Amino acid sequence: MKVLIDDKIPYIRSAAQWLLGDVDYLPGHAFGDSRQLAEADALIIRTRTHCDEALLANAHRLRFIATATIGHDHIDADYLRRRGIAWTNCPGCNAASVAQYVRNSIVKTSFSLLENREQRTENSLENREERSIHAPLTVGIVGYGHVGRAVRRAVEAMGCRVLLNDPPLEEAIRTQLRRSSISYLTPEESPSVEGVLPPEGEIEGASPSTTFVTLQEIAEQSDVITFHTPLTTGGSHPTLHLADSAFFASLRRRPVIINAARGGVVDEQALLCAHRDGLVGPMVIDTWEGEPNINSHLLREAFIATPHIAGYSADGKSCATRMALRAVCRHFGIPIDDEAQFLALTAPPSLPPEVQPSGRWADDALTLYDPLLDTARLKASPATFEQQRGTYPLRRETFE
């Protein structure tokens, strides 16, 4: 069996050689120029490789593609289905990294938040021995997939109250419950979901006890609003400009706005107007409309501005590599006989020995990742957005 692998996928070479044997590496853009493609049984790729008929017409042996990414817009699923080629992506591989970004951004904006609520006291983040940032902020999470769930865990650990909004997921849960001929009057009346709902992943985060609120409630009650939806233009719940001028006009608490979803989920012109009108507090922008040619006015006014790197941690890349390799092994019936060896071969690099936790959670969080450092680089050189993203030094999520 021959496997072709994108040569920019980190932490994969030793494990791939150990598990798969006959492995070749190519730049993502060079797969179409390679005679090796005709001999490949499997590909492990990134978004740079567009898997469609133009690329794969002569790949007669190909049976499986794993993309070591969450996104799969570069996969022509209909064509692969017609060809009988199986494929997978790596959903949730960088969810913890995005959650780290959101949590640390909240830490950096917390003093402004406390001023908004007139609760900046000695018990706030100035006393970093405290576990919670104060009693408590309300964080509205829009989009409750893998990333939204990771964000919820991260901010609840800080002592925050959480509001959830995800109409498609809420409808999917209701539909599944109707099919099961079971209805619940309140979350408290809900029995165990075992045997009622499909396993997590078929309906992400599905549980009849999950409480959702409307976007209007998010707008009225939240101190922080963070977006984690895909960008969609059709269907009953399109997300293009989900946060528009009407949404910003309904805000009540001058919240922090965080967009680490997709550029276009937030209407940037409406956001700028709302910020200038005092409706919005600090702005945290990682995903931009028109990338890499980003809005210079928004860049200037954003408190945190980064080049679409919220998910760029070494831990997340390691997770994607592991998921992709496991998928190939599962598809071809290749056993992973030594799990400890597999994890060791795909592990991200350790931090320098001088980088040690202090025991003060906020300090430790910012030691691992301070988003203002990335902000300074982007504001100094916005024209190098794509270069900064492509050469980003992968951060660690933990001290381990």
PLM feature spans:
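Intrinsic disorder/low-complexity segments
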Residues: L114-A135, R174-T211
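Phosphate-coordination loops involved in phosphoryl transfer and adenosine-cofactor binding
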Residues: L62, A135-T138, R254
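NAD(P)-binding Rossmann-fold cofactor-contacting core
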Residues: A30, M158-L177
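Phosphate-binding beta-alpha-beta segment of Rossmann-like dinucleotide-binding domains, i.e.
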Residues: I85-R153
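Rossmann-like adenosine-cofactor binding region
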Residues: C51, E171-Q176, S180-P187, P208-S296
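N-terminal glycine-/charge-rich "phosphate-binding" loop or analogous flexible N-terminal tail
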Residues: M1-A40
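Rossmann-like dinucleotide-binding domain for NAD(H)/NADP(H)
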Residues: R254-E400
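Phosphate/diphosphate ligand-binding glycine-rich loop within oxidoreductases
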Residues: A42-N116
